Amino acid sequence: MVVPSAAPASEELFRRAERVVPGGVNSPVRAFRAVGGTPRFMVAGNGPYLTDADGRTYIDLVCSWGPMILGHAHPAVVEAVSRAVSVGTSFGTPTPGEVELAELIVDRVGPVEKVRLVNSGTEATMSAVRLARGFTGRSTIIKFAGCYHGHVDALLASAGSGVATLGLPDTPGVTGAATADTIVLPYNDLALVEAVFVERGETIAAVITEAAAANMGVVPPLPGFNAGLRRLCDIHGALLILDEVMTGFRISRAGWWGNEGAIEDWSPDLFTFGKVMGGGLPAAAFGGRADVMARLAPAGPVYQAGTLSGNPIAVAAGLATLRACTDEVYATVDTRAADVAGIVSTALTEEGVAHLPSSAGSLFSFFFTDAATVVDYAGAQAQNTARYAAFFHSMLDAGIYLPPSAFEAWFVSAAHDDETVERIAAAAPAAARAAAAVPEPVTVSASPEGRA
C-alpha cells in the first residue's frame, strides 16, 4: 500500500482550494486522484527543476504537460515576456507579433498555408472541426478511442487523458445530440476506418487523430496508419485533421508531420497546435490548406473569434520559444528522453516488474503490463495502475516529479543535464522495488482524464 509523504504547505493549500475550486484543482489530472495523496502546489521553476510550497525541489518530468521544452524560466522567454508586458498586456487589435508567429508556423510546417491563433488546444480542435464541417457541408466526424482533443462536447466520447485517468467512459453534460455525429473507432485499426467510409463516406466531414496518440499513455501510429487515413479521406472527399497540440514543435521543428508525413509524402488538410508554441502561456493555433482556411470569417462564412486570440504576451513567449528551438535543442531532448526511458525500463526489468516502454519521438511512457504491444485504448487500459502509483510516490519522495497518472506522457527539456539524469538513475531502483511490491492481479483502469 502506498503511503504518500506529508507535504504540510501543499496539504493546507489543497484544503483551501477544495473550499473554492471544484475538486481543488483547475484541471482534473492535477488532483492526484489516480495515484493518491495530495497534489504538490508549485511556486517556482528553473531549468529542469520545480520547487513546491514546502520548499522541496524536484526534477520535472512533466514540463507543464509539454510546453516547457527549453526548461523553466528560460532567459530568452523571460526577457521576451517582460519586454512585452512592459508595453501593455492586451490591445484587442492585430499586432506585429502575431504576424511574425503565424509566418514562423507557416515557414516551419510546409502544408500550413494559413493559420489562425487561438488560446487553447480545445479551441483549436473545436474550430478545426467546425471549419471542416463548413467546408465540406457534411456533419460526421471520425475520432479514435483514447485520443483526446480537448474538452469539446463532440470529441469527449471515449477520450483519453483526464477522462481516462478518472475512468470516465464519457461525461455528464454532453448530450446525445452533441455526439450523434461522432463515430468513435479503435486507434490504429485502418481496416475498420475503411469499412466505415464505405458505409457512410458521403456523410463524413473529417477524420481527426492525434499525430501520435499521447493521452492514453504514448501509443504511436502503426506504420502506414496516418498515411492510410489520408488515402481514405482523399477517396471519400473528407478532410484529415492532425492534432499536433502535444507533438507540434516538440518532436521536431515541424512536429510529428516533419518526421513522418514529410518523409512519406502525405499531409493533412488541417493541423492543430498548442503547448510548445505558447512557451508556457495560453496560445494555440489551427491552420492548413489556404482554400479551407479561406472559409473562415472574416474571409468566409465559418465563424470563429476570441477576445484574447493572438495575445501579445503569449505571442512573445511563443516566438522566443520557437526561435530558441534549434536542431541542437531537439537533439538534446531526444537524447535525454532516451536516457530517462532506458534508465526507468532497466530498473523495472531488474526488479521483475512487467512493463512496456512506449515512445513517439521524445514523448514516452510506460504501460505496467506484460503485453508485448499496446496499439489502442483497450490495450492501454489493461495495466496495473497501482504499480504505477507506487512507482510515482517513490520517485516523488526522491525528488523526481512524474505525471500523476499512468495514462499521461513523460517529458524532458533541453535543460535536463547529466546531473538530472544521474539523480533519476539513483532514484529508479527503489521506485521499481516499490512497484514490484504491489501484487498482481492487474488492476484494470476503466478508462484515462484529459489534457492537463
Swiss-Prot record:
<dbReference type="GO" id="GO:0005737">
    <property type="term" value="C:cytoplasm"/>
</dbReference>
<dbReference type="Pfam" id="PF00202">
    <property type="entry name" value="Aminotran_3"/>
</dbReference>
<dbReference type="InterPro" id="IPR015424">
    <property type="entry name" value="PyrdxlP-dep_Trfase"/>
</dbReference>
<dbReference type="GO" id="GO:0008483">
    <property type="term" value="F:transaminase activity"/>
</dbReference>
<keyword id="KW-0663">Pyridoxal phosphate</keyword>
<comment type="similarity">
    <text>Belongs to the class-III pyridoxal-phosphate-dependent aminotransferase family. HemL subfamily.</text>
</comment>
<keyword id="KW-0627">Porphyrin biosynthesis</keyword>
<dbReference type="InterPro" id="IPR015422">
    <property type="entry name" value="PyrdxlP-dep_Trfase_small"/>
</dbReference>
<protein>
    <recommendedName>
        <fullName>Glutamate-1-semialdehyde 2,1-aminomutase</fullName>
        <ecNumber>5.4.3.8</ecNumber>
    </recommendedName>
</protein>
<keyword id="KW-0963">Cytoplasm</keyword>
<dbReference type="InterPro" id="IPR015421">
    <property type="entry name" value="PyrdxlP-dep_Trfase_major"/>
</dbReference>
<dbReference type="GO" id="GO:0030170">
    <property type="term" value="F:pyridoxal phosphate binding"/>
</dbReference>
<keyword id="KW-0413">Isomerase</keyword>
<dbReference type="InterPro" id="IPR049704">
    <property type="entry name" value="Aminotrans_3_PPA_site"/>
</dbReference>
<comment type="subunit">
    <text>Homodimer.</text>
</comment>
<feature type="modified residue" description="N6-(pyridoxal phosphate)lysine">
    <location>
        <position position="275"/>
    </location>
</feature>
<comment type="pathway">
    <text>Porphyrin-containing compound metabolism; protoporphyrin-IX biosynthesis; 5-aminolevulinate from L-glutamyl-tRNA(Glu): step 2/2.</text>
</comment>
<dbReference type="InterPro" id="IPR004639">
    <property type="entry name" value="4pyrrol_synth_GluAld_NH2Trfase"/>
</dbReference>
<dbReference type="GO" id="GO:0042286">
    <property type="term" value="F:glutamate-1-semialdehyde 2,1-aminomutase activity"/>
</dbReference>
<dbReference type="GO" id="GO:0006782">
    <property type="term" value="P:protoporphyrinogen IX biosynthetic process"/>
</dbReference>
<dbReference type="InterPro" id="IPR005814">
    <property type="entry name" value="Aminotrans_3"/>
</dbReference>
